[in-house]
Amino acid sequence: MSGHSKWSTIKRKKGTLDAKRNKIFTKLIREISIAARMGGGDIDSNPRLRLAVNKARVANMPKDNIEKAIKKGIGDNMGSEYFELTYEAYALYGVALIIKCLTDNKNRTASEVRSVLSKSGGSLGAPGSVSYMFHKKGLISYNLDKYHEDEIIELALEAGAEDIYSEGSQVEVITSADNFESVSSILRTKFEEDIAEVALVPESKVALDKEQMDKVLAIIEKLEDCDDVQEVYHNLEIVDDIC
């Protein structure tokens, strides 16, 4: 997705789902189980679980798998204790990365992330070296094949949305992190979203030529392939039709 949207990585990420479905499902199941363990198995009262389940639905995970993951989280058979880790790093050409991980072995995860970066020309940064370049925002995306754009925009603005982007068959509602739950709840009374999540959005993006962009994307994808890596946020400007 190119153009004015701040969420230009969504189509690229969704396009990789089929090729990496099993690994993606494993990560989503882990996130669902941990969210259920931390906040309970009711998605209406557990925002983190609701976000995790929404991601699983977007990835076309079977309902049975989602329910099993929730039951695992609230049961006594969770297995290993998992830790949330965040790494700040740089890829090539000054592109900043924030790498979110869930792991049962901190040393293994640190070694794997460091190895991917060092072999690709990137490097780990100190805490705070990158995070100031990003801020949390809520994203709620709707398919215009299902709903009328004007109705979504009207209700989103009434609910307190910060911004609204329209591109192709999608409308993307942007909220502050604090207002995400309230805005999404109001919109959910009339519309069913395709995507609803809180993400780290860069203050500005780094524009590169196609060869450079492809090299950075390769690093990001290698990190995403790591078993313990849940999300990789970056400030690379992705342009599909770059010359």
Swiss-Prot record:
Keyword Transcription regulation in record: yes
SUPFAM superfamilies xref list: YebC-like
Top-level taxon in the UniProt lineage: Bacteria
Gene Ontology terms describing biological process: regulation of DNA-templated transcription
Alphabetically ordered keywords of this record: Cytoplasm, DNA-binding, Transcription, Transcription regulation
Cellular compartment(s): Cytoplasm
InterPro entries referenced in this protein's UniProt entry, alphabetically: Integrase-like_N, TACO1_YebC-like_2nd/3rd_dom, TACO1_YebC_N, Transcrip_reg_TACO1-like, Transcrip_reg_TACO1-like_dom3, YebC-like
Molecular function terms, GO-annotated: DNA binding
Record keyword Ribonucleoprotein present: no
GO CC annotation: cytosol
Pfam families from the UniProt entry: TACO1_YebC_N, Transcrip_reg
PANTHER family cross-referenced by the UniProt entry: TRANSCRIPTIONAL REGULATORY PROTEIN YEBC-RELATED, TRANSLATIONAL ACTIVATOR OF CYTOCHROME C OXIDASE 1
Family per record: Belongs to the TACO1 family.
Name recorded for this polypeptide: Probable transcriptional regulatory protein BDU_30
